[in-house]
Amino acid sequence: MIEITSNTIVSTITRALKDKFPEYLIYKDKKLQGLKKPCFFVFILNGEQEKANSKIFNRDYLINIRFHSDCTRPEIDEVAFELLDILSNIQNGELILRPIRPINYEVIDGVLQMFIPYKLRVFKQEESKVTMNNLDSKGVIK
């Protein structure tokens, strides 16, 4: 069983993007200075966790992917359609990412932004509890 962290999710998505678009740079932070187009930015906008029972948690993540380029609008739309296919089912070993709601996207000032909601079910293992050692006491009663 793999440990699920926010970095695991972002890395899984960036790996899928890199497989489809090997010539594009992919950033995992919001650095805008010195970026080389075309490129993607991948980051988590927000997350939420809800306890299902003592060992199971449901985690919701809203992922934002931005595509910066000098492409025309039809070319950007083509990238958007390819991303819809890629992001609808991503698998990395035991981790499977499928959106829980429709994927939304918009193009503003030539920048494609996609919003992808994922839900994961996380199983927490009980931490081993330290038990006390035996205590031998010797006493006398008077």
Locations of the language-model features?
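Charged, amphipathic alpha-helical segments and their flanking helix caps
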Residues: 1-27, 47-142
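A short, hydrophobic beta-strand-centered structural micro-motif
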Residues: 37-45
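Short gly/pro-enriched beta-turn/loop segments at secondary-structure junctions
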Residues: 35-37, 60
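Short acidic low-complexity segments
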Residues: 27-35
